[in-house]
């Protein structure tokens, strides 16, 4: 029997199905409760799993009586922990050095800067580091935690007034600053392994940071055979040349495209892209990113990577929490909407807390990127015109 330890985050994963050949040797520790656990070697729902060391301690205890072949995780915040366990137990997979290159955004920029353009940046110890950076580089700048995701706790400072307002916030010990880069933002999602290569490129509908100020956002897939997709794929390869990469890797790359048509690294993560990216990929390419990545990581066979042009492209639009008591319509009147979901868990009056906060979201189909974008904007307009006013408290944080 092959034993595999899994530190899980995703609430919908079905590990007995995804890794069915190994099911009775899977030992799963999950941040979110899982519905499909029958047949697993062991399973524990660990409250706040990504914040507490329990899963790591239990895996090390279990390793006294069994030989784990693999330690895997779907969660960016567990990459370093999983790598540390692997190295201590002599298990192949992503190293701690590699995980840190992708997790610490200062180290990430230092690493990527060997092969591609990055914004100017600095790690912050005190407010003086920030003011010196601004004096040297001018406004606007972006201040953010070095290891956070989902646009959480990111602040754009455009002038002295913004700086003074920022100085009233609680100081954190994990901050960095970088130039604000003007331009469109693209994302490239890939799974790379010996004999396997899948790369797909998309453009964000708007700036991800706009969600925090009330802008709706989403993304739209690019034609995989188009010149821009090929350029983005080449940029991904150049970025990864600078990194220590595991034999099997999933990557979510975010790229600025400046008005001068130059690419500048935003960030790269060593995991599957979040939000609607997995769902859009399944609809267009018939590929489950998580299943493919985890099966390859465990040495299990997968179907060949898609290599024919897709019949259609897709995109997503998320309507941000409105900050006032409203409800989203329960359905949409468009036959090209392939999925629509209302966030029933959202408190009335909630406001956005990160780039994935939503009142509702829709996935749409189109013949090409231009039609997808037009339909996303049509859906956005229709939903906003049909919000339902409701009684309730105002300005609660979104879950």
Protein language model regions, located:
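Peripheral (often C-terminal) accessory segments that flank ATP-dependent C-N-forming ligase machineries
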Residues: 5, 133, 294-399
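Phosphate-binding core of ATP-grasp and ATP-grasp-like enzymes
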Residues: 170-174, 180-222, 230-264, 269-277, ...
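Active-site nucleotide/adenylate-binding loops and adjacent lid/helix of ATP-dependent enzymes
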Residues: 102-182, 193-195, 222-238, 377-380
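Short, flexible turn/loop "capping" segments at secondary-structure junctions
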Residues: 145-147, 212-213, 352-358
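Short, well-ordered beta-strand elements within core beta-sheets of diverse protein domains
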Residues: 155, 179, 282, 360-367
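ATP-binding N-terminal substructure of ATP-dependent carboxylate-amine bond-forming enzymes
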Residues: 1-97, 128, 300-303, 367-368, ...
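Glycine-rich phosphate/pyrophosphate-binding beta-alpha loops
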Residues: 151, 269-285, 345
